[in-house]
Amino acid sequence: MAYLFTSESVSEGHPDKVADQISDALIDNFLAFDADSKVACETLVTTGQVILAGEVKSNTYLDVQQIAREVIRKIGYTKSEYMFEANSCGILSAIHEQSADINQGVDRAKPEEQGAGDQGMMFGYATNETENFMPLALDLSHKLLQELAILRRENKEITYLRPDAKSQVTLEYSDDNKPTRIDAIVISTQHDDFDEEAAMLAKIKKDVIEILIPRIIAKNPEHAHLFNDKINYHINPTGKFVIGGPHGDTGLTGRKIIVDTYGGKGAHGGGAFSGKDPSKVDRSAAYATRHIAKNLVAAGVADEILVQVSYAIGVAEPMGIFIETYGTSKVNLTNGEIAKKVEAIFDMRPYFIEQRLKLRNPIYSETAAYGHMGRKPETVTKTFSAPGGNEKTVTVELFTWEKLDFVDQVKTAFGL
């Protein structure tokens, strides 16, 4: 029997994502000047105020206020009527030194013996229902908001958009687990107060259906068949949405972990990513398990794969690796036997994850909105500034965990 599945996303201007982006901008700046920095940075954003708190072990000093303001400015909070504005918001820093008790579990004389920064379990997931091996409902939810942000910055076809927004896509699946159509789309977008409420809501709904949706279809022709005239659109269903962003809702780092990963597909170990340097396995091992799952699916081991890894704090070797193929395996092996082969291909000790995926680089700001997974790997050059005229330009690879660089090795190991 056909069934429905739903995923959501939030925009870069959503309060929780503002917090994530500030935390990850701090991570990038610390790593740019000291690649061995250990950082855990949490951010709270609310009406006219940003609070930074966390633990740091680094040889560099940063102007954290300036970094936070630049992130807020880039997102688009640049008007006083938003009640949260880059130049005028207050910024309080309570960042202090990392505990020596925690650090002793991570630092080792031999780098390869580096212990996990914490206990816990992390999951990676991949499915072949999209070209980027991501669940389709989440992928479309991200793309709706990315395109809405493009329209906001263009300020031509739609001129009233503000930074805060959310989306949700409900797909209908067939008995054989294939997406057949979009059943519903929900979009709530912050906007200027430009007319009477009923007129504003009618205009916004019309623009979403007649401007945003055609642009999504044009950029994603492989999914055009899923769009139809029976889609149930809920556009700003609560009414006008003028008060938004951190003024409308307080935002915190790490509160959008399902948006960041697989939209409710697969599983999640509970640990957030943003604000954590790669010694924190919550982040590095989640990227590594995604890398494994994606390469296994791309190699043809299964149509859908979930990978779990677990750690004890201060211990390099993982407690174990678990594989689930949801009955889609293409190889004559049990899930346990697949896991054994995976262990032989991918070294999951924290140091080797960092080296394999080049994680000790300033690559995290780009992950902090529109999902950490399913993004396109690319090489970029970035410039960072620190007090005293100190400047650093680095060329880095983004989203290395999305590379299909182990497919041949996987095929050889599994005889594919």
UniProtKB/Swiss-Prot annotation:
Gene Ontology CC: cytoplasm
Keyword Metal-binding part of the UniProt annotation: yes
Keyword Transferase in annotation: yes
InterPro entries in alphabetical order: ADOMET_SYNTHASE_CS (IPR022631), S-AdoMet_synt_C (IPR022630), S-AdoMet_synt_central (IPR022629), S-AdoMet_synt_N (IPR022628), S-AdoMet_synthetase (IPR002133), S-AdoMet_synthetase_sfam (IPR022636)
Subcellular location: Cytoplasm
Region described as Flexible loop: spans on this chain: 98-108
Primary localization class, coarse: cytoplasm
GO function terms (MF aspect): ATP binding; magnesium ion binding; methionine adenosyltransferase activity
Binding site for ATP: H14, D164, A165, K166, K240, F241, D249, R255, K256, A272, K276
Cofactor-binding details, from the entry: Binds 2 divalent ions per subunit. Binds 1 potassium ion per subunit.
Enzyme's top EC category: transferase
Positions of K(+) binding: E42
Sequence positions that bind L-methionine: E55, Q98, D249, K280
GO BP terms, alphabetized: one-carbon metabolic process; S-adenosylmethionine biosynthetic process
Binding sites annotated in the UniProt record for Mg(2+): D16
UniProt-listed PANTHER family: S-ADENOSYLMETHIONINE SYNTHETASE (PTHR11964)
Protein family (similarity comment): Belongs to the AdoMet synthase family.
Functional summary from the UniProt entry: Catalyzes the formation of S-adenosylmethionine (AdoMet) from methionine and ATP. The overall synthetic reaction is composed of two sequential steps, AdoMet formation and the subsequent tripolyphosphate hydrolysis which occurs prior to release of AdoMet from the enzyme.
Protein name: S-adenosylmethionine synthase
Species of provenance: Flavobacterium johnsoniae (strain ATCC 17061 / DSM 2064 / JCM 8514 / BCRC 14874 / CCUG 350202 / NBRC 14942 / NCIMB 11054 / UW101) (Cytophaga johnsonae)
Lineage: Bacteria, Pseudomonadati, Bacteroidota, Flavobacteriia, Flavobacteriales
Protein encoded by which gene: metK
